[in-house]
Amino acid sequence: MRRLCTIGHTKKPLEHFINLLRQSGVDLVIDVRLNNTSQLAGFSKRDDMAFLLREGFGIEYLHLPELAPTQEMLDDYSTTKDWEMYEAKFRELIVERDMTHLVLDHASDYDTPCLLCSEDDPTKCHRRLLAEALAASLPDLEVLNLR
């Protein structure tokens, strides 16, 4: 793995979403959402996403909820809107769950895996924090946030 992409499905029509993945050479999408079955966009639901990516475009799909924040963290952030507190807690969770090794265990055989979440903007999304942790452990890793 020399490159890691991140993407959020919100605010993206299906065609744009797929084009971003294909143009970036993504060969594995790792779904880092805790809840991935009740999203508004039909294509973003777990089973639909897996079928679409694999059958339509030859992109593997893997849901790893271990890479998501806890429900308590999501609820706290929804109430407080305190990004700094959320970020600090999630960075602790990255270490506690050994998330970087979990990603590497699943993605090492792929050229360009992509972390998928719902947030359009990676600035305030846990996928950015996870990508930063991976980049810190792999100095030659290029991270691209697809928008």
Residue ranges, per PLM feature:
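Residues lining hydrophobic/aromatic ligand-binding pockets adjacent to catalytic sites
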Residues: 1-147
